[in-house]
């Protein structure tokens, strides 16, 4: 790696493919964001932005939101469906419905709604999956189309609130997830004097592939079978309310990577739609649910972290399949609804934080073992010396295997009391030296050596201790092995001479990022430039805007991070519009029913009992500051 250019950095981190044009690397080697696609030359340096916030008193880690990205995602998705509708001469329209479960933060929901302010005909609705979410959307939906889709399991209170939504001027679709909900809707609608808008969630036979595939298929947690759907139709006929059935919904699962799965699912659901129309139901909305994926690793593949289609292809497939099936069955074309929350929100947020320290292997001179040392150590010494004399590629593999076997035996003998601590330490250092030399000699183009190279990269990787909680800020990385792009925010104009793994500050061995976007694939380590306390750089975790905040937990009582809303104006100036303080220690204690006020009283009693009078005020002040302080590290 004697020659290095910014283009190498851009390709190495695959930024152009996962960023959708929102993020990039400047010629100076700094990560930038272009939040306003209307002015792509306007860029914000994330490193400089973070330093400005720190100077203003905002401690890291900080979650930075770029609302202009939300606006663009809404507009772009609607535009692609509108173009597909025109292309296939589809005889209805498209409505984007945002499921607030993806990110319920007020700033996020309000910015998504604000994208409709200038629209003559709003093309956005909201979805709720619980009573708290329904209460929120009842107060917010009028800022867009006033369309509300109610999913999830429901009780009488949920149903009454949804029906009250109709009285408030909203168009509220109550999607039946199970048979018992129909009876409650019929009873409560009569009591309130409201004609309900009903939807059905069909349980398709087809099941898409992916981490969330259980959301679809015949064994899905939600939805009605074909027989149950017929019972609903018959019951509504008996009640003379069949016209209330207006929406068909299905869901293949989140993050569907293969466009064929989407096409197959839409085709089966379209047949349900046509059959319902033939039975006399006036269904006029076709809700494809979620599934629109985000290309987290930028590989444009069928992996769980990617997608093998573009947005236009997604819209074209849905519209074309519906057009064909409706024409074949001589049925009117319904309004198309999608609940594409992950696509809307993932890119808009970046977690920025600092490295509090590193551990790195540095080659050391290895002395020859004493003549009377165990034979095992002499074997390892021979392997070390053979590296320089046996340079054929097969010999390198043999040396690696021999050394690993010898190290395992040395550790076993130590555990049995047959090897001294000094001998074990020598064996481990010799092994590291051998691995370090082999790492430089092996060739990634040799397919037999690739697995060993990966193992060496992982074994010799620097350990970056990063000021964040994986469980709070990237829970899907821990829970379902979701990949999120990770980058140093500066120094990318330098050769990445090291490889590293990112460890969080929780007391949990699972608190490690073990997958990284690297070129056109996923690796277990990340290439990074040299890091030092004298010349540190910050770390950015990207595409964290969907699900991560609401799923994050309080492991070790690390709470919500600070967050900021940042916008770029028409002159290209950066505006930090608002900063929301993260959780204090007192906040997280309260979440687990621990009372900071009573703790303070206890501290006072202990201080009065154990601390000299001239120190009491100082000690009490530090304890009080501790309760009011940030849960993350601030002084290191």
UniProtKB/Swiss-Prot annotation:
Q: List the disulfide bonds.
A: none
Which biological pathway?
Amine and polyamine biosynthesis; agmatine biosynthesis; agmatine from L-arginine: step 1/1
Residues annotated to bind substrate: 286-296
- A Pfam family assignment: Arg_decarbox_C
Q: Which GO terms describe its biological process?
A: arginine catabolic process; putrescine biosynthetic process from arginine; spermidine biosynthetic process
Please explain the role this protein plays, according to its UniProt record.
Catalyzes the biosynthesis of agmatine from arginine.
Protein name, please?
Answer: Biosynthetic arginine decarboxylase
Q: Which organism is it from?
A: Shewanella amazonensis (strain ATCC BAA-1098 / SB2B)
